UniProtKB/Swiss-Prot annotation:
MF (Gene Ontology): interleukin-1, type II, blocking receptor activity; NAD+ nucleosidase activity, cyclic ADP-ribose generating
Tissue and organ expression note: Detected in fetal brain after day 12.5, in particular in parts of the diencephalon and in the basal plate of the spinal cord. In postnatal brain detected in cerebral cortex, olfactory bulb, in the CA1 region of the hippocampus and in Purkinje cells of the Xth cerebellar lobule.
Keyword Lyase among record annotations: no
Segments in the Cytoplasmic topological domain: 376-686
Catalytic activity: NAD(+) + H2O = ADP-D-ribose + nicotinamide + H(+)
Signal peptide positions (record): 1-16
Gene name for this UniProt entry: Il1rapl2
UniProt name for this protein: X-linked interleukin-1 receptor accessory protein-like 2
The family this protein is said to belong to: Belongs to the interleukin-1 receptor family.
Organism this protein belongs to: Mus musculus
EC number(s) stated in the UniProt entry for this protein: 3.2.2.6
Database matches in Gene3D superfamilies: Immunoglobulins, Toll/interleukin-1 receptor homology (TIR) domain
Superkingdom to which the source organism belongs: Eukaryota
């Protein structure tokens, strides 16, 4: 009888001693209420869970057996609002076992607070425990609301234990625990070791963060507990660092009175283990809360975060800046390692400064516009100036004989319309004359320079290959006759155009819209890889200082300009006997021919078609007549020179004796045109 009484006194003494060490949270009707214990019980629906009375583990220095032997009773209640309802244990799904409640198969409706009360006639104390039961989230083996949380610094050692496993441990053996990461089996690397019911990571890396689930079987049911591991940076030993304003470098902000203003304060916080960054503004020795109502702080914004390291921003807001606000403002940042600060000085904006700034920006803007306009209007002139001063010579060592191949249509003068005369005269006379005599380019003109050595197509292809540019003059007659067909039908010429082997200069002498074959011209443009399009606009383009000639020279090969004498204008086939002759305009040639040549009816075998075909093969040249030479009054000092027939050049004479006199007359008369037979190798389109 004395022994139980002595034991009761010891228990009561232990309880009383413990109560002196822990401050009471509440006391109702003489019963000490410790409110809700910090430990939270969590389980998935359908799994077993054990809720222990926290009094025996955190609040008194005794266990359930000793308390029971002294006459103390343990009773369980479930909190429903402000009421505590006694629990009736059914022994089927929920039962009482010593100091705990066993849920053999927990359900979501079991979630709530459970209170254990330990009392006798003299003493009473109680504490509540929280239980949360939830279903698995879709496709997962856990619910994110009932995860345990663990943190570890990167490169440190971390052990993740399986929570509450002691409740399911049998005395004779350790539980067989299986670990998963993100609900999937994983082949752990060598530095991750399973140690009993725990997982040991010897050196934590950033990718080790995630959800770890431990699983075991207990009485035929699965028990799973999930722990979220958050990997952080190493614990910092430095105070935060201000990013703006700069530390030890006060920033000056020019403000306009009456206008709103926002001043951001940005700072970097290393990982310190604290719940949140501490950042605030002050004006002198006063906090912002002590100032006028038109000045306030915004919300702290998280700009960046990585492994617990944060970059945050706090904005100082002025609804309307007044004169009294022109002062120094300081942004303070701190953690448990120290404090840093940075300052901003508000200064009234000077109107003159604003005008100067606007004027300077305006001047720069106008200068840029002026330069843009100058370049837009004179870009070709600028490029030509640069090429003349600093450019090289494109014709050096390229193994090409001609600067350009000139392709145009040879038209009979009598068939020209009055509307097309200017275009055809430009193609036949003005264009080659200016390029060769004024700019010193060497052109290949098939009518003049083609010397047959094989078939016509082969000779033409060879000459195009020897040229650096291909100039196509789109006159009305050229378009009508589809003069470009040869460049599409002959495969070698076509390949040169589409591959960019030769650059093509396309000169439009007329408006293409509405013309016959205009669609084919557009198709030709699309097929040429290197194409430059230049438009000739009639007489105003004929002036040497016009935009047309500058553009044309810009597209021609880069070469050093050479002043040519009149004798150099003639090609090699025209030198020798006629080397000193000077060219005269076609009008003079026509008048000369009309004066000296007998009438067409008087010439034997003279055909009108031959005359039209050969009119462009004759050229007039001017030279000084010797004093002792008898001049023809109707001619003055003009002579007319025609190309020699190929039959004469080759030393061949016709076999037909009946035509001997006529042919002899033709050979001895320099004013007659070549016959169609002698020019059988030529073409109307060059």
């Amino acid at each position: 009888m004395k022994l139980p009484l002595l034991l009761a006194l010891v228990v009561c003494s232990a309880v009383s001693t413990n109560l002196k060490m822990v401050s009471k949270r509440n006391s109702v009707d003489g019963c000490i209420d410790w409110s809700v214990d910090l430990k939270t019980y969590m389980a998935l629906a359908g799994e077993p869970v054990r809720v222990k009375c926290a009094l025996f583990y955190s609040y008194i220095r005794t266990n359930y057996s000793m308390a029971q032997s002294t006459g103390l009773r343990l009773m369980w209640y479930r909190n429903k609002g402000d009421l505590e309802e006694p629990i009736i244990f059914s022994e089927v799904r929920m039962s009482k076992e010593e100091d705990a409640i066993w849920f053999h198969s927990a359900e979501e409706q079991d979630s709530g607070f459970y209170t254990c009360v330990l009392r006798n006639s003299t003493y009473c104390m109680k504490v509540s425990m929280s239980l949360t039961v939830a279903e698995n989230e879709s496709g997962l083996c856990y619910n994110s609301r009932i995860r345990y949380l663990e943190k570890s610094e990167v490169t440190k050692r971390k052990e993740i234990s399986c929570p509450d496993m002691d409740d399911f441990k049998k005395s004779d053996q350790e539980p067989d625990v299986v670990w998963y990461k993100e609900c999937k089996p994983k082949m752990w690397r060598s530095i991750i070791i399973q140690k009993g019911n725990a997982l040991l990571i010897q050196e934590v890396q950033e990718e080790d963060g995630g959800n770890y689930t431990c699983e075991l079987k207990y009485e035929g049911k699965l028990v799973r507990r999930t722990t979220e591991l958050k990997v952080t940076a190493l614990l910092t030993d430095k105070p935060p660092k201000p990013l703006f304003p700069m530390e030890n470098q006060p920033s000056v902000i020019d403000v306009q009175l009456g206008k709103p203003l926002n001043i951001p304060c940005k700072a970097f916080f290393g990982f310190s283990g604290e719940s949140g960054p501490m950042i605030y503004w002050m004006k002198g020795e006063k906090f912002i809360e002590e100032l006028a109502g038109h000045i306030r702080e915004g919300e702290i914004r998280l700009l960046k975060e990585h492994l617990g390291e944060k970059e945050v921003e706090l904005t100082l807001i002025f609804d309307s800046v007044v004169e009294a606000d022109l002062a120094n403002y300081t942004c303070h940042v701190e953690n448990r390692n120290g404090r840093k600060h940075a300052s901003v000085l508000l200064r009234k904006k000077d109107l003159i400064y604003k005008i100067e700034l606007a004027g300077g920006l305006g001047a720069i803007f106008l200068l840029l516009i002026l330069l843009l306009v100058v370049y837009k209007c004179y870009n070709i002139e600028l490029m030509l100036f640069y090429r003349q001063r600093f450019g090289g010579d494109e014709t050096t060592d390229d193994n090409k004989e001609y600067d350009a191949y000139l392709s145009y249509t040879k038209v009979d003068q009598d068939t020209l319309d009055c509307d097309n005369t200017e275009e055809e005269q430009f193609a036949l006379e003005i264009l080659p004359d200016v390029l060769e005599k004024h700019y010193g380019y060497k052109l290949f003109i098939p009518e003049r320079d083609l010397i047959p050595s094989g078939t016509y197509i082969e000779d033409l292809t060879r000459c195009v290959e020897q040229s650096r540019r291909l100039i196509i003059v789109l006159t009305p007659d050229y378009i009508l006759r589809r003069g470009w067909s040869i460049f599409e039908l002959e495969s070698r010429l076509h390949n040169m155009l589409v591959s960019g082997e030769i650059k093509v200069i396309l000169i439009e002498c007329t408006e293409l819209k509405g013309k016959v074959n205009c669609q084919e011209v557009e198709s030709l443009k699309h097929n040429i890889k290197l194409l430059s399009l230049i438009k000739w606009k009639g007489p105003k383009s004929s002036k040497l200082n016009s935009k047309f000639w500058k553009h044309l020279v810009y597209e021609m090969p880069i070469k050093k300009k050479e002043m040519l004498s009149h004798c150099h204008v003639l090609d090699s086939a025209e030198q020798g006997l006629f080397g000193e002759l000077q060219p005269i305009p076609s009008i003079a040639m026509t008048s000369t021919s009309a004066t000296m040549v007998p009438s067409q009816a008087d010439l034997p075998e003279f055909h009108h078609s031959d005359s039209m075909q050969m009119r462009h093969c004759c050229r007039g040249y001017q030279h000084e007549m010797p004093a002792n030479t008898l001049s023809v009054p109707s001619l003055g000092n003009h002579h007319t020179y025609c190309n020699l027939p190929l039959t004469l050049l080759n030393g061949q004479l016709p076999l037909n004796n009946s035509l001997k006199e006529t042919e002899e007359f033709s050979r001895n008369n320099p004013l007659l045109p070549l016959t169609s037979k002698e020019l059988s190798f030529t073409s109307d389109i060059w």
